Amino acid sequence: MSRFTNCIKTARPSAFKTIWWLTKIMVLLSLAIMLLQYIGVIEWISYLLTPIFSHFGLPGEAALAYVSGYFVNCYSAIAVMTTLDLSTRAATILSVMVLCSHNMILETTVQHKTGSPIIKITIIRTLSAFILGWVLNKIMPGSFESSSLTNSIQEELTFAIMLKDWALRTAKNIVLMAVIVYFLTVLQKILTEYGIIEYISRFLKPVMIFFGLSPRCAFLWLVSNTLGLAYGAGIMIEEAEKGETTKEENDLLNMHIGISHSNLEDLLLFTAAGGAYLWMLLSRWCMSLIWVWFFRVTETLSHRDTK
């Protein structure tokens, strides 16, 4: 059997295991969130947050976009953003906040599987969104401006329509997820078998060191930053189970990619919605760098004190 064929064969069990686990999580959590949307819980939380958003230079209506993204995903947030008349400045600030903390329930569940506490990652990502919102409001050119809803048609959806929409959207996401996870698992096996992973780690070593991350996480960092957090989960889980990366290394990586991931599709979508690409990318890289080095320095000092 050729090395290439063997890579495909050995990748199947771990790929299918991850796909099945992600499918269960995606179905259960997305259904629960859809029900919360239907009974009005998401809108109620948005209403409570509305007064806070003036501190981020955003109109009150932006709270609904943020909360929608927080519990659902970026697409949901963008759908609300398109109903608001936002300046580039406001769209950028709101986009950064959503990018830091979107799809929180699903993504923190995935990150927990790789060794990071759900509460810790949730706090870090939520705080990052609020801190960056406040900081960007202070340093970005321009000033606060109110917004108004556009003349988009707001229709009240029945439960049957919402359920059908959820089923179709979830099925599409599961198929896409399955294809990408399987492809990435096979690719990782091939890159490892032919020693290419070592070259990637070596090439990205300066970047990893700058961000405070282990060079052994280079491929995982690359996958998460380009394609997304959930898609790299299968590889990350397998690496952790095999002991290729330590719990501490995974935890630091999770802090970074929790704030900054999917920097191709998601960033382009928010750019199309009015955000400024470089502000959205660099601000989150800075925040993730600060968190990782803060925890590394804190850990070093605590070890020094115990000696």
Cite the ranges covered by each PLM segment.
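Hydrophobic faces of alpha-helical transmembrane segments in multi-pass integral membrane proteins
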Residues: K24, L28, A32, V41, ...
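Transmembrane helix-loop-helix hairpins in multi-pass inner-membrane proteins
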Residues: S101-L157, E265, F270-R304
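Selected transmembrane alpha-helices and immediately adjacent juxtamembrane segments
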Residues: M1-I52, T126-I209, C286, H303, ...
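Hydrophobic alpha-helical transmembrane segments
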Residues: M34-W44, A63-A77, S116-T126, L168, ...
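Helix-coil boundary and interhelical linker segments in multi-pass alpha-helical membrane proteins
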Residues: Y38, T82-R89, S143, G274-A276
